[in-house]
Amino acid sequence: PTNRLGRKKTLFWIGVFYTISALGSAFSNDPITFAFFRFLGGLGVGASTIAAPAYISEIAPAKDRGKLVGLYQFNIVFGILVAFLSNYLLSGIGENAWRWMLGVEAIPAIIYTLFVLSVPQSPRWLLTKLRNDEARNVLQLINPGQDVEKLMLEINQENENKVTGENIFIKKYRFPLIL
């Protein structure tokens, strides 16, 4: 979905999925409804493992990409820690504690979704869609003082030389792929 919808729109829908999953799981009254909303949350998690690092690597300056993608991974672990702590604190509130544990997930999900609205679209994605003026504006925003036309040319050259998934199955990659 990130190539079709764009990174930003995909990240927004991931936040919507997270929010609906949290609230739906907390308010579900039967196992099938509960499973449906947990599945919806799983779709959001799965999509975020691809969309978020892709967005970060495409929007970050080259010198900061590794650090920022690493920070994304750290934040996943930190989020798990916060979830354990919040679940511990909520565990003693009675027989509906599980509903609170699931429903409280909606708070960071809503905050995330609202913040996604303020981030710029990926300039690399914009260039692949031939939306050059929008890409130029984003590049000027995130790379002040740099030659934006040169950056656009470099990104376009990288996009042209990009190895697609279909190329992985050619003969020269077959043996390493099997390993």
What do these predicted regions represent?
Residues 1-179:
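Transmembrane-helix signature of 12-pass secondary carriers
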